[in-house]
Amino acid sequence: MVFTKSLLVLLWFLSCYTTTTSSALFNPPDNYLISCGSSQNITFQNRIFVPDSLHSSLVLKIGNSSVATSTTSNNSTNSIYQTARVFSSLASYRFKITSLGRHWIRLHFSPINNSTWNLTSASITVVTEDFVLLNNFSFNNFNGSYIFKEYTVNVTSEFLTLSFIPSNNSVVFVNAIEVVSVPDNLIPDQALALNPSTPFSGLSLLAFETVYRLNMGGPLLTSQNDTLGRQWDNDAEYLHVNSSVLVVTANPSSIKYSPSVTQETAPNMVYATADTMGDANVASPSFNVTWVLPVDPDFRYFVRVHFCDIVSQALNTLVFNLYVNDDLALGSLDLSTLTNGLKVPYFKDFISNGSVESSGVLTVSVGPDSQADITNATMNGLEVLKISNEAKSLSGVSSVKSLLPGGSGSKSKKKAVIIGSLVGAVTLILLIAVCCYCCLVASRKQRSTSPQEGGNGHPWLPLPLYGLSQTLTKSTASHKSATASCISLASTHLGRCFMFQEIMDATNKFDESSLLGVGGFGRVYKGTLEDGTKVAVKRGNPRSEQGMAEFRTEIEMLSKLRHRHLVSLIGYCDERSEMILVYEYMANGPLRSHLYGADLPPLSWKQRLEICIGAARGLHYLHTGASQSIIHRDVKTTNILLDENLVAKVADFGLSKTGPSLDQTHVSTAVKGSFGYLDPEYFRRQQLTEKSDVYSFGVVLMEVLCCRPALNPVLPREQVNIAEWAMAWQKKGLLDQIMDSNLTGKVNPASLKKFGETAEKCLAEYGVDRPSMGDVLWNLEYALQLEETSSALMEPDDNSTNHIPGIPMAPMEPFDNSMSIIDRGGVNSGTGTDDDAEDATTSAVFSQLVHPRGR
């Protein structure tokens, strides 16, 4: 980790630290600190927790409960986790509230060792009167010491009731509870929503869960360092590129609070440290510092960003931009102008619509403004809070009434059925009327508009200009073809020109039941042509600027590429201003569905190697087979498709970029790709080379081996990123410990060793240390040979080369990056040929789509 902090920051804090609680400005009217199951007061982080059985203002309503005490030795730093209250039936804590308004609800859980209860098997559901806080939370992947959950809810009555609901054949437990008043002005009722940028009101009616609270550049701050008892974590593990930042510090006592930003907003220790742009030797001034935060994609998020200019020596010298999920949240931000000084805190709130983030990742970035004299950007703190959904839940879609057994929801069941029936009948009548009207309007439009007229306003031209002649042709596959004509370029390999009516018939008028996927450019449907051929139809969305750009890029790439391991194209349709590409249908879909997330039989080790080899051949052809290399930029398991014989093809060229020419070493370009697969050097320098694809392919290799996503936010933090996690095991020589359990005892150790070495080389931090795709292909084929040959005969030692007798390849040392790979056995290395084109149509393909926000 390239930080200038570590010991210096710790020494700095020790030299200037004073306990902030001594100068607390806010005294919470309600301040319940409850130690559940304890028989005496417990001191934790300089705060006193009172036993739940002795608190005078607390009413504990329980059915069957008991106390669990840890059988391990007592640890004073985690003393509240030595006991727990265990419930086998519905139970509740009732708190008397003296001051209405927002309150923190903090829950502490630790499945302590106990001879009576197996708390690791507990399933926890916690609700208030109005909101679901936790729903069937389990400890299946738990390997830490405790779990801490923090919520804020607006209490509008004299009492706050927390109900704990065990699931069937399980128990629920809790170690400690905090219910603490929140300052009235800490969370506003309105914030700016992004994409589209509009005010979002009504926050006071919603509940929040703290997902992240980060101290940029500084150490962990516990409740002892915060006047409101909050915890601020160090941000290092969420930086997309650790070496992209330089930490700057100031004396906490020099921070100048204002009436609008007080000690309650954030401690001065947060504003006294900052991450700034490090000297990363970037080629582009648009380089950003980015934090990647795994989130639940089904919720909105309240994002608060904290700033304080402790960097500048003079006013108006630091101007930068803030981005949330690639949306410009703040442009040309000059902190000294906004605060009328230096070292004056400032914060801004936003609402991010997480429901469109299918990747489950929220990103926050800062970068220099294009007009700034100094290339720099900074951030001091970041808070991300999950917002309750329409069901008033922070965990799933179930409401409180549906979770409480025998609650008020069941009492009004008959009434709800009657009302629902009436509403349904009225809705059905209105729906029929609307459908009739829409059909009438559509019929009139179809009669009044000819297909030829629709062609006059094409927003796109699916005809790459490669100096080839254009010829007008008609589709002859249907009798409907005589009604229209369209432009076709057979010589550009765009294939057959389809009539729009043919597409409509093939997809049953784009029936939603035929939907295969959704992407930034539009949708992909499964269809069947008149001759019975199954196809995948990609229909572009003309309102999506990103989609149109990716759509054109894919057309341009596919028109000049033909290879057995690249997606092939049947034809297109540009009638009626449509943007439609037609591919042959890929029977076995994306590689990812065969690894996890789908109920499919596990792939054997040999099958996995053959699939990786096929994908490597496709990428090697992209890099070396065309007149100018092509960089895919979005290599991942959803973009590797499998035909009925599990032959792999690389798909989705929407982000592809022509590589550097012979006199160039790289292409400077804005960073695009998918988090988890993105080359850190490309992200840091914005210099794109073929080695960026190699890095992404290394992630794919680890994904194939371990059968888990590239990013998995539900795992412990050190396991979230598969590249970092798997590399740690590979360097210890223990890669077999984390591979898919279906492969245990079924993999030749020599083959696994070569596979791991190949992936490790691909995931090198710097591109110069990574192999070419040709070298990767060579080594994967070697791993396959080792799998097919006796381990005793083929066991490689540390000094072995990658020469395999019997394979027609030029002998070379493994990963010799000084060599230019021109030809390999079994790899088509020339430019696209008719033979290649014929080969490319032997298996069915379609381009797997992912949501563009995940890129």
UniProtKB/Swiss-Prot annotation:
One annotated GO molecular function: protein kinase activity
Enzyme class: transferase
TM region(s), chain numbering: 416-436
Side of membrane Extracellular, spans: 23-415
Residue ranges of domain Protein kinase in the record: 510-783
InterPro entries, A to Z: Kinase-like_dom_sf, Malectin-like_Carb-bd_dom, Prot_kinase_dom, Protein_kinase_ATP_BS, Ser-Thr/Tyr_kinase_cat_dom, Ser/Thr_kinase_AS
Induction of the gene: By brassinosteroids (BR).
Tissue note: Expressed in most vegetative tissues, including leaves, stems and roots, primarily in expanding cells and vascular tissue.
Signal peptide feature range: 1-22
Active-site residue numbers: 634 (proton acceptor)
Post-translational modification: Autophosphorylated.
Pfam family, one: Malectin_like
Topology class, membrane: Single-pass type I membrane protein
SUPFAM superfamilies: Protein kinase-like (PK-like) (SSF56112)
Coiled-coil spans in chain: none
Segments for region (Disordered): 822-855
Additional record remark: Semidominant suppressor of the cellulose-deficient mutant procuste1-1. This protein was called 'Theseus' after the Greek mythological figure Theseus, who slew the brigand Procustes.
Function: Receptor-like protein kinase required for cell elongation during vegetative growth, mostly in a brassinosteroid-(BR-) independent manner. Mediates the response of growing plant cells to the perturbation of cellulose synthesis and may act as a cell-wall-integrity sensor. Controls ectopic-lignin accumulation in cellulose-deficient mutant backgrounds.
Protein name: Receptor-like protein kinase THESEUS 1
Organism: Arabidopsis thaliana (Mouse-ear cress)
